[in-house]
Amino acid sequence: MLARSLGYRLISTSRILYNKPTVKSVVSSCPAGTSLNLNIWKSGKDAVALEDKEYPNWLWSVLDSDHVVEHAAEDPEGQALLKRRKNIRKANRQRIKQNNFLSQL
């Protein structure tokens, strides 16, 4: 029995595994006060970058795919929404391919 138990690999249960990683402070790509040249109106003003702390916290995690999947797993409606979006994208691609094929005839 002792020989049998030595063949198994022990699983580490250290506290490091249970601790969630701390949120890293994200630094924006441009300093505060920089003109972003996003104006689309003739008489409008250019948008100006703000301090990083003035933006909402969720903004820094929008592009993280892990973050989207994590929240979708928590929310069953969100998971259904992701599945619906995927199906809509697939249908749109198919429609575009069909239209391109028909335009070549």
UniProtKB/Swiss-Prot annotation:
CC annotations in GO: mitochondrial inner membrane; mitochondrial large ribosomal subunit; mitochondrion
Signal peptide as annotated in the record: none
Gene Ontology molecular function: any one: structural constituent of ribosome
Principal localisation: mitochondrion
Location in or out of the cell: Mitochondrion
UniProt-listed GO biological process terms: mitochondrial translation; sporulation resulting in formation of a cellular spore
Transit peptide interval: 1-24
Keyword line: Mitochondrion, Ribonucleoprotein, Ribosomal protein, Sporulation, Transit peptide
Sequence similarity: Belongs to the mitochondrion-specific ribosomal protein mL54 family.
Known role: Component of the mitochondrial ribosome (mitoribosome), a dedicated translation machinery responsible for the synthesis of mitochondrial genome-encoded proteins, including at least some of the essential transmembrane subunits of the mitochondrial respiratory chain. The mitoribosomes are attached to the mitochondrial inner membrane and translation products are cotranslationally integrated into the membrane. mL54 may have a meiosis-specific role as it accumulates during the middle stage of sporulation.
Assembly and interaction partners: Component of the mitochondrial large ribosomal subunit (mt-LSU). Mature yeast 74S mitochondrial ribosomes consist of a small (37S) and a large (54S) subunit. The 37S small subunit contains a 15S ribosomal RNA (15S mt-rRNA) and 34 different proteins. The 54S large subunit contains a 21S rRNA (21S mt-rRNA) and 46 different proteins.
Note: Present with 1100 molecules/cell in log phase SD medium.
Name of the protein in question: Large ribosomal subunit protein mL54
Organism the protein comes from: Saccharomyces cerevisiae (strain ATCC 204508 / S288c) (Baker's yeast)
